[in-house]
Amino acid sequence: KAPFDIRLQIRDEGLILNDSGGRSIHFEPLFPGEISYSRSESLWLARGGVAAQHSSQPLSALWQVLPEDVRLSPHVYLATNSLQGPWWILSWPERVPGADEVLPPEPPAYRVLTGVVDGFGRTLAFHRAAEGDVAGAVTGVTDGAGRRFHLVLTTQAQRAEVFRKQRATSLSSPAGPRSASSSLVFPDTLPAGTGYGTDNGIRLEAVWLTHDPAYPDEQPTAPLARYT
């Protein structure tokens, strides 16, 4: 399972890995190619920057399944909780630079999950929305075969608006229901917090295949999956 909410804070005094379970795991700053292990959380955190690890490093074999550009980049961090993988790639989302922006821009002081590499070298790349109601959320996935998938996300406010329109249509119909259920309310927002932290109300509605290299001229007319 990919921890989509995993986030790495990069500070002068150290690194803080936050996950969707509410954990904040602290590490010392890492030099390029260095790997640190948290015994309390059974988690490794690594920094790219070397082509290979020393044979005495327990993760040396797993390191070699990573794409070369990931292994060699000191700006990329990686995490894993198993010697068999997968690696969680921590980088920053793609974005279009501004017209007056100095290139290349400085890397931000945080990293988010941008990909997964399993123990056999198979990859998934995650693409996040740059703007809009779901900015920052994963809305696209590219697998190792080059297939691209679009994840349709909705917010609580969008679902509430759809509910109100459907309810209004139903009540205006001669055959529409006239019962106490017509007073049902679909809130625009969710409670501020839950036992699992803040719920942003974003939900996955459907998954579409948008490109398949094996069938480049064919596009599905229905989603691969739909969630209600």
Predicted ranges, named:
Residues K1-T228:
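Surface-exposed recognition patches
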